[in-house]
């Protein structure tokens, strides 16, 4: 994980509230598995004040704190771990912060862990992909084909790069992501807030049930597309909350983190929180379902999955 440096102006939050939100996730995960937290040297005192003593703080210069996107994607090659180092340019130059330091984070993590890093020839982020471990990867036209990310690529060339990096052989392309994700500092359509695979291969998919919300029609389109691909779809209904202080929200239970023995899942103090818990208990049998207030994270433009990046065991 990465310790946040500041809040976004439009979030309506102060710096301390943002740091508290990130820290709550880190502390919860640390109950189940080791946690490393990258932290700008100027923020070490604030981090030490908020984080469990078991969390390993690593001083690193970084712009922002979305480790899913700026950290490496770990793969196994010839029985050894390799860190995939995607090019990062601030979600297609769509952030009020810089990104030069963040583009170097994946390589630095690989160096800290003493594993080889492979620099990719395309711009991509960890939140822009999701795999089932069986050869399938989910991608989004508005992310990988974004002209401010990869202007010289088409679906075929992007898929070739992705398959080469991840060892996948089937790409399923979503046409777009959620409406709010195109707003201000959004990612322009990351899949990790829309759909994710359960361990048994079923696909959890965000379902907005309010006809007033701009994401309402997306469910029908995706359910049909995924069914045509031969996937079993499990709807995960969106919270009843539709708007925040800015506009339509993208509150989603899809954006959770699976750790050793548990699933760390968003909570929105919403009537649908309990139904989401039940759905996740079905999707992840035998794991604790730990729900944390995620409204501050979503006000910043992401969720629990967005701020975490799993490191396979036996490394570092």
Question: What residue spans do the PLM features occupy?
Answer:
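The feature marks the mature, well-folded catalytic cores of soluble enzymes
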Residues: 2-316
């Amino acid at each position: 994980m990465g310790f946040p440096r500041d809040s976004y102006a439009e979030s309506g939050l102060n710096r301390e509230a943002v740091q508290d939100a990130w820290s709550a996730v880190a502390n919860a995960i640390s109950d189940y598995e080791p946690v490393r937290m990258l932290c700008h040297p100027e923020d070490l005192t604030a981090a030490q004040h908020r984080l469990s003593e078991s969390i390993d703080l690593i001083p690193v210069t970084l712009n922002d704190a979305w480790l899913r996107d700026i950290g490496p994607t770990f793969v196994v090659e010839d029985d050894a771990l390799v860190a995939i180092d995607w090019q990062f340019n601030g979600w297609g130059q769509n952030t009020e912060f810089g990104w030069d330091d963040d583009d170097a984070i994946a390589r630095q993590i690989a160096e800290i862990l003493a594993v080889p890093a492979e620099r990719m020839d395309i711009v991509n982020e960890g939140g822009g992909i999701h795999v089932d471990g069986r050869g399938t990867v989910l991608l989004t036209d508005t992310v990988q084909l974004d002209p401010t990310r990869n202007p010289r690529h088409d679906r075929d060339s992007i898929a070739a790069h992705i398959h080469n990096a991840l060892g996948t052989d089937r790409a399923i392309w979503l046409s777009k992501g959620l409406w709010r994700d195109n707003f201000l500092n959004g990612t322009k359509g990351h899949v990790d807030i829309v759909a994710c695979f359960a361990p048994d291969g079923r696909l959890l998919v965000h379902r907005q049930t309010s006809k007033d919300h701009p994401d309402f029609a997306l469910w029908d389109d995706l359910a049909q597309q995924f069914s045509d691909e031969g996937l079993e779809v499990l709807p995960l209904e969106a919270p009843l909350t539709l708007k925040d202080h800015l506009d339509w929200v993208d509150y989603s239970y899809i954006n959770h983190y699976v750790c050793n023995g548990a699933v760390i899942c968003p909570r929105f103090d919403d009537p649908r929180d309990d139904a989401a818990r039940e759905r996740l208990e079905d999707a992840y049998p035998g794991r604790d379902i730990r729900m944390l207030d995620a409204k501050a994270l979503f006000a910043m433009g992401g969720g629990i999955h967005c701020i975490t990046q799993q490191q396979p065991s036996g490394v570092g």
